[in-house]
UniProtKB/Swiss-Prot annotation:
Source organism: Nitratidesulfovibrio vulgaris (strain DP4) (Desulfovibrio vulgaris)
Note describing how the cofactor binds: Binds 1 [4Fe-4S] cluster per subunit.
Annotated binding of [4Fe-4S] cluster, by residue: 300, 360, 363
Entry keyword Metal-binding: yes
EC top class named in words: lyase
Cross-referenced NCBIfam families: hacA_fam (TIGR01343), IPMI_arch (TIGR02086), PRK00402.1 (NF001614)
Pathway: Amino-acid biosynthesis; L-leucine biosynthesis; L-leucine from 3-methyl-2-oxobutanoate: step 2/4
Listed HAMAP family: LeuC_type2
InterPro entries given in the database record: Acnase/IPM_dHydase_lsu_aba_1/3, Acoase/IPM_deHydtase_lsu_aba, Aconitase_4Fe-4S_BS, Aconitase_4Fe-4S_dom, HAcnase/IPMdehydase_lsu_prok, Homoacnase/IPMdehydase_lsu, IPM_dehydratase_rel_enz, IPMI_cat
Cofactor (UniProt): [4Fe-4S] cluster
Protein name, as recorded: 3-isopropylmalate dehydratase large subunit
Record key words, sorted: 4Fe-4S, Amino-acid biosynthesis, Branched-chain amino acid biosynthesis, Iron, Iron-sulfur, Leucine biosynthesis, Lyase, Metal-binding
Reaction equation(s) it catalyzes: (2R,3S)-3-isopropylmalate = (2S)-2-isopropylmalate
Length: 419
């Protein structure tokens, strides 16, 4: 049988022959992860099911990234509980403090996930690792507890939608614009329990960071996973992260897709997702006179070094509007240090940005950038549901780094090509 990317990877991790979408299979997992919000729930379930040890102390990752640095007593208690569990179980990959980053940027950087892996996490944006050619998906904390104990879980093999992007990317149009365009076309439930498989010349041209940006938001269309073929760029990235033994692979010729979509990127312009759903997508040029009080550049979607370079290029020699607070959150300590070496941190500070630690913070309305009634933000994050970043009476627009940075300068949502 000719396999899609999702089927091909799952087949490597099960002893059952995968013959069709919809089939139920048990798969061995390569990595299991949870964070400071979801790990305590998983630990409770782990105890309740009578588990005594994690299946492999080197293949469980616990990353304290959402409410950290601990924003209040409850957050501190959550982290303490998880820390004690990690020590009890001898978990190798426990991250808190100076070595901690946003989980979906940190794990690829450390070489803990890669091509052909099956990764499950108690976080919906676990699908990020599809940018590396992994079948990666979010599960509930109870299922993650089971995976931590057993080293396996069950899946219904998802049908696959193939999205082909052709042409050459124009200036200021990047991976975020591509994925928002796709979500705008099919809706927030357009890929419900489907794998999204990305290909085409424009996809091949993206760097691995851009691919992770797109895979990250597969869930915003309801996707079970977002997948890219593993190619030479993937292998170079993974080798630099310390991985060995990875190999390139792609979907089989003749694989069956439930649906095929095609987008020509050549004439694209920057886009934004308007409140209050990621599929409410419009060209920036059509969003007129929309003022913003906050800009957030960071997150598991767009907090990597390439994103910071893109934002800094727009901000260099310019000042953030006095009516705007622009918050820049490099996604890992490694990215922070690289940005420091390249002078990007200086650029952000000179422009008047607030540069903070690696945290999910404002993305989920947790801390370090909460919106008041009537306030509006543009952010490089992944969700703009009502009340997502604070007050139910606030609004969030989603964009790529260049558009966010340009909007910080003008105080209104701005196409960076017009500066």
């Amino acid at each position: 049988m000719a396999h899609t990317l999702a089927q091909k990877i799952l087949q490597r991790h099960t002893d059952e022959a995968i013959t069709d979408a919809g089939q139920i299979v048990r798969c061995r997992v390569s990595m299991v992860l949870a964070n400071d919000i979801t790990a305590p729930l998983a630990i409770k379930s782990f105890r309740a099911m009578g588990a005594k040890r994690v299946f492999d102390k080197d293949r469980v990752a616990l990353v304290m990234d959402h409410f950290t640095p601990q924003k209040d007593i409850e957050a501190a208690q959550q982290v303490k509980l998880t820390r004690e569990f990690a020590r009890e179980m001898g978990v190798t990959h426990y991250y808190e403090g100076g070595d901690c980053g946003v989980e979906h940027a940190l794990l690829p950087e450390l070489g803990l996930v890669g091509p052909g892996d099956v990764v499950v996490g108690a976080d919906s944006h676990t699908c990020t690792y599809g940018g590396l050619g992994a079948f990666a998906t979010g599960l509930g904390s109870t299922d993650v507890a089971g995976a931590m104990a057993l080293g396996e879980t069950w899946f219904k093999v998802p049908p696959t939608i193939r999205a082909t992007f052709t042409g050459t990317l124009p200036a200021y149009v990047g991976a975020k614009d591509l994925i928002l365009t796709l979500i705008g076309a099919i809706g927030v439930d357009g890929a419900l329990y489907r794998a999204l498989e990305f290909d085409g010349a424009a996809i091949e041209a993206l760097d691995v960071e851009g691919r992770m940006t797109m895979a990250n938001m597969a869930i915003e269309a309801g996707g079970k996973a977002g997948l890219f073929a593993a190619d030479a760029k993937t292998l170079t990235y993974c080798t630099a992260a310390g991985r060995t033994g990875d190999a390139a692979f792609s979907a089989d010729a003749g694989a069956v897709y439930e649906r095929e979509l095609s987008f020509d990127v050549t004439g694209m312009t920057p886009v934004v997702a308007c409140p209050h759903l990621p599929d409410n997508v419009k060209p920036v040029s059509e969003v007129k006179d929309v003022t913003v009080q906050q800009v957030v550049i960071g997150s598991c979607t767009n907090g990597r070094i390439g994103d910071l370079r893109e934002a800094a290029a727009v901000l260099r020699g310019r000042k953030v509007s006095r009516d705007v607070r622009c918050i820049v959150l490099p996604a890992t300590p490694g990215i922070w240090r690289q940005a420091l070496r390249e002078g990007l941190i200086e650029t952000f500070m000179e422009a008047g940005c607030i540069v903070g630690p690696a945290t999910c913070g404002p993305c989920l309305g947790g801390h370090m950038g909460i919106l008041a009634d009537g306030e509006r933000a543009i952010a490089t994050t992944n969700r703009n549901f009502k009340g997502r970043m604070g007050s139910l009476e606030s609004e969030v627009y989603l964009s790529g780094p260049a558009t966010a940075a340009a909007s910080a300068v003008t105080g209104v949502i701005t196409d960076p090509s017009t500066l």
